[in-house]
A protein has these predicted regions:
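Broad gene-expression machinery/nucleic-acid interaction feature
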Residues: 14, 60, 98
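Long, hydrophobic N-terminal alpha-helical segment
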Residues: 3, 10-56
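Helix-adjacent hinge/juxtasegments
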Residues: 66-95
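Short glycine-rich, low-complexity/disordered patches
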Residues: 45-52, 94-103
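Intrinsically disordered, low-complexity boundary segments flanking structured domains
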Residues: 1-6, 89-90
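Short histidine/acidic/glycine/proline-rich micro-motifs that form metal-
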Residues: 22, 69-71, 104
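Terminal interaction module
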Residues: 96-160
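Short glycine-rich or small-residue beta-strand-to-loop segments that form or flank ligand, phosphate
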Residues: 16-18, 61-68
Length: 160
């Protein structure tokens, strides 16, 4: 069952999917419809999940589940991956590749392979103050506090 993202407990489990490009406003509107329909019927072992999503910067899809109400199961997580794959096919983007880094350069959001980001760090094109998106955060609370952080405060720090 759909619950507004801001109404879920801060301890809710999240999954972040990033696109290598910014989605158009029209694509975001379509994604909103697909995700809302999915979440309305998302269940684990026939029990509806209290869940939500948010799309940030037209680039990141964040799914969330209130694990205190009922935890997501393997099958329900698989179902969420299938809807993400549906969006990938519809928009011709890659949302599941975790070997990429997304970071800010001023107000612009850039997307690089991990190898390219590592080279950029070595060449000092990015540094510990570069704002990165830490997609390894696990809860809404972590998302709010540690998702957009200086690289020095994230797993990205190993490159500096």
């Amino acid at each position: 069952m759909f619950i507004p993202f801001e109404d879920l407990p801060k301890s809710s489990k999240i999954w972040i999917y990033q696109s290598e490009r910014k989605l158009s406003d029209e694509e975001v509107q379509i994604a909103d419809e697909i995700l809302k329909n999915f979440i309305e019927t998302w269940a684990a072992h026939s029990t509806p999940l209290e869940a939500s999503y948010v799309i940030k910067y037209n680039r990141f899809i964040v799914l969330a589940v209130n694990q205190e109400h009922h935890p997501a199961s393997g099958c329900s997580i698989d179902a969420s991956v299938r809807v993400i794959q549906e969006l990938e096919q519809k928009f011709k983007v890659d949302l599941l590749d975790k070997m990429n880094v997304t970071y800010k350069t001023g107000e612009f959001i850039a997307h690089k392979t991990l190898i390219d980001f590592k080279k950029m760090a070595k060449e000092k094109a990015v540094n510990g103050n570069t704002i990165v998106f830490n997609n390894l955060v696990n809860t809404i609370e972590e998302f709010e506090e540690f998702w957009e952080v200086p690289a020095a405060e994230s797993w990205h720090s190993r490159f500096f």
